[in-house]
């Protein structure tokens, strides 16, 4: 481009297609049946761990920040018994700080 104002003659458009790109992939995926069998075998090998995993539940706990009283959400995955321990800690001396107050300290 020459000059202060571009003109149509200054703009060069080259709309030639690039060399063709092969978009085909020769990769083969494993069948999902094998994965399902592995998962079943995994559960049969460790039944105690499988039972424990089923007992864990996700809980949302809303706790006010100890500095600014902004509500902080805690996502906890635990058993009911462990949730009671967390509840006792939060009712006692344990405090929670929001990210803004934590970064300013």
Swiss-Prot record:
Specify whether rRNA-binding is a keyword of the entry. Answer: no
* The protein's role, per its UniProt record: Plays a role in viral genome replication by driving entry of quiescent cells into the cell cycle. Stimulation of progression from G1 to S phase allows the virus to efficiently use the cellular DNA replicating machinery to achieve viral genome replication. E7 protein has both transforming and trans-activating activities. Induces the disassembly of the E2F1 transcription factor from RB1, with subsequent transcriptional activation of E2F1-regulated S-phase genes. Interferes with host histone deacetylation mediated by HDAC1 and HDAC2, leading to transcription activation.
Segments forming unnamed zinc fingers: 65-101
Q: Which HAMAP family match?
A: PPV_E7 (MF_04004)
Would you name any one GO CC term? host cell cytoplasm
Assign the protein's first listed, main location to one coarse class. host cell
Name of the protein: Protein E7
Its gene is E7
Pfam family of this protein, just one? E7
Q: List the molecular function annotations (GO) for this entry.
A: DNA binding; DNA-binding transcription factor activity; protein domain specific binding; zinc ion binding
What keywords tag this UniProt record?
A: Activator, DNA-binding, Early protein, G1/S host cell cycle checkpoint dysregulation by virus, Host cytoplasm, Host nucleus, Host-virus interaction, Inhibition of host innate immune response by virus, Inhibition of host interferon signaling pathway by virus, Interferon antiviral system evasion, Metal-binding, Modulation of host cell cycle by virus, Oncogene, Transcription, Transcription regulation, Viral immunoevasion, Zinc, Zinc-finger
* Ranges where the record places region E7 terminal domain: 1-45
What species was this sequence derived from? Answer: Human papillomavirus 56
Origin superkingdom: Viruses
């Amino acid at each position: 481009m020459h000059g202060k104002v571009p003109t149509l003659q200054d703009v060069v458009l080259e709309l030639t297609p690039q060399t063709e790109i092969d978009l085909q992939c020769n990769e083969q995926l494993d069948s999902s049946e094998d994965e399902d069998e592995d998962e079943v075998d995994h559960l049969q090998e460790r039944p105690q761990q499988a039972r424990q995993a089923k007992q864990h539940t996700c809980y949302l706990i809303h706790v006010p920040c100890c500095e600014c009283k902004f509500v902080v959400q805690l996502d906890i995955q635990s058993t009911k018994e462990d949730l009671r321990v967390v509840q006792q800690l939060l009712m006692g001396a344990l405090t929670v700080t929001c990210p803004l107050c934590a970064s300013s300290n």
